[in-house]
């Protein structure tokens, strides 16, 4: 990627599309989003009709996703809260954070298998909320 090409983004735990909205306002193209809740998906379909909805993060394979320059995500945090049982990243909900890491690893391995140089592996940037 050079600075003269379009920067692209994928969004995990997309919700109502906060990351894609910020991306568009900054000249970045949202390519795909992962979300499981029906209402938020409908919102993002209206806001971003060209964005692909890829479904449940636990069922995704990073090598099969369209390559993007940036991945954003805000995984559930209930198990990290001091108000809860404090299960941490081994908790059922907050443990989904590790799915984000798996997706990035699988995407980068696929890029490497296609012959891309290590310094150019995508996604190049991650933004976790």
Indicate residue ranges for each PLM-predicted region:
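Conserved active-site and SAM-binding loop architecture
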Residues: 1-129
